[in-house]
Structures are given as structure tokens and as C-alpha cells.
């Protein structure tokens, strides 16, 4: 069930601090207009502990899970299956993220019940896909009622293809995806650090003045205050 006034509570699961920061910055940006409240954990086991705190009969603590695919100890795929088994009558929407666009991996997750599969890093164009998978939205990314295999949105270009007939596209560079996430974090950090530049400049001037004063006192004590070339 969604939070008050249309706020979707998202449980973010990712072992990468950079990728967690990218998602948090994006979903808390002005473009999202307060549509999401993000709770972040760094492992699938911690996510299971969080979900296990729910008492039977109570409302769900979160509205959807956004998880990385590759994580140590317990993968995002294993977390997906555990969540679907945890609440079969009222399943929690699960969106899987990965830096590799592999059709077999996408098909595996979708067949296990994932609502969507997004290639990292998460971008502004992916926000609507998260909204589509909200419990309040009946047009989520499910299989059609005709029993045909689900049509998957490959996140690299958002072209709809059939998972059973698509030829494997060249996987995107993991390094490129990682660098894009790092660049986004560095950009936000540079904005925050810019406020400290005046203070840093004044501090450097103060240190320089202290060093100059120390040199003058040293020359004075040696009796050569006016001799600039005194050794």
C-alpha cells in the first residue's frame, strides 16, 4: 500500500555505495517532486531482516523493492524469489537492476516474478517505470492475459522486444555505467563542497600570515630584522 499523498516507499538494496547514492539522489530530486521515500540497505540479508519485521496482518512497511542483481552472499535474484514466497497473496513489487544487459538474466528475473529489469545506472527516464510498478498502478509490467511470454523492456534503449526471440545485444560496458554513477555523485559533492571554498581560502591566508610572523620574529631575535638577505 502506498504512503500518504502518493509517496511510494522504496526499499533500495545494493552493495555499492556509489550506486545507492545515485538512486537516492535521483529519487529525491525535484524532478520526482517527493514521489518516493527511499530506505537503503547494503545487502539482501539486511533487506530480508527489514521485511521480516512486519507483523502478520499489518500494512507493508514498503511499497516496492529496488534491488541490484549481483551481490555477495545473497543475490538480487535470490532476494526476488524470497520476497515473492514471503507474501504470495499480496506480493511486493520487485524491480531488479544490473550493469549488464543480458537477455537470459532479464528473462530469468521476469519469470521469477520481477515487475521490471533496469540497466544501471538508474536514469531520470527510468523513474516513470518505477511509478508504473507501484501497487496503485494497475498497468504494471506483467505478462499479458493471452498467456504469451512477457514483452521485456531492455533498459539500454527502452525498445520492446520478445525475450524468446531477441538476439543478444552487445552488453554495455560495466566500467562506463560505473563511471556515469561516479560522475553523478562527484557532481553533487562538488556543489556541496563549493560552500566551503571561502572558508578554506581564509584558512590558507591565516596559515600564511602565521608563517610570515614566525619568520619576522626569527629575524628579529637574530638582530637582522631589516636585512632581507640575512641567513
From Swiss-Prot:
Disruption phenotype: Dwarf, albino, lesion mimic and low fertility phenotypes. CDD domains: REC_typeA_ARR (cd17581). Expressed in roots, leaf blades, leaf sheaths, shoot apex, flowers and panicles. The modification 4-aspartylphosphate is found at residue 68. Residues 9-135 form the Response regulatory domain. InterPro entries: ARR-like, CheY-like_superfamily, Sig_transdc_resp-reg_receiver. Induction: By cytokinin in roots and shoots. Keywords: Cytokinin signaling pathway, Phosphoprotein, Transcription, Transcription regulation, Two-component regulatory system. The keyword tRNA-binding does not apply. GO terms for biological process: adventitious root development; cytokinin-activated signaling pathway; phosphorelay signal transduction system. Functions as a response regulator involved in His-to-Asp phosphorelay signal transduction system. Phosphorylation of the Asp residue in the receiver domain activates the ability of the protein to promote the transcription of target genes. Type-A response regulators seem to act as negative regulators of the cytokinin signaling. Involved in adventitious (crown) root initiation under the regulation of CRL5. Belongs to the ARR family. Type-A subfamily. This is Two-component response regulator ORR1.
